[in-house]
Amino acid sequence: IKIDNFLKENSNLIVVFHQSWAVSLLETYFDNEEGYNERSDLEYESHLEPIKIKTSSLKERQQYIKEGLISQINKIINQGHKLVLVYQVPEMGLNPRRYLFRKYFYNKNLFKNSIPVFSGSYEVYKNRNKLIFEILDSIENPSIYRVYPHTLFCDTTIRDRCVANDENNIFYYDDDHLSIQGSKLVVDEIMKEIEKIELKSN
């Protein structure tokens, strides 16, 4: 309600819209299908549904989420604001800091020539986020700008893989939240979109 009121009371805002979409839409924690997962029990312990409406299936809840998300985005646009949509950040299924520490602790020789890079399947990312991409991509408006975090981490330094670190930086704070270094990369992309908006406004 506070956010809605703020958007009503102010004009020509640039709104950055991002959240972890996958877990709410799929109701499962992340499994990288290579031996690492977010939780031992992958089933999400709660789900989203409209107030005073009891849903009976995941498909029904997904439809409500889709309708609600599209409605909220259109509401922001129709109030005259510009919107930067930030798509799903790749999930890793483990804490890369702990992973690298354990690697170093048990086998320091691995670090003699280079730093091991932890990565996950880009295909797994695409499959898991297919629905949210379809929903966000279906909303077309010249006032919408888009940022794709996966283009920073996936299919870049390693083909068909999403990386959690490189030789110099660890991009994740834990299994799915970006570190300061990782966040800076995404924020730089957001700022590029904001600059485009400001150039058009002048």
What residue spans do the PLM features occupy?
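Extracellular glycan-modifying ectodomains
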Residues: I1-N202
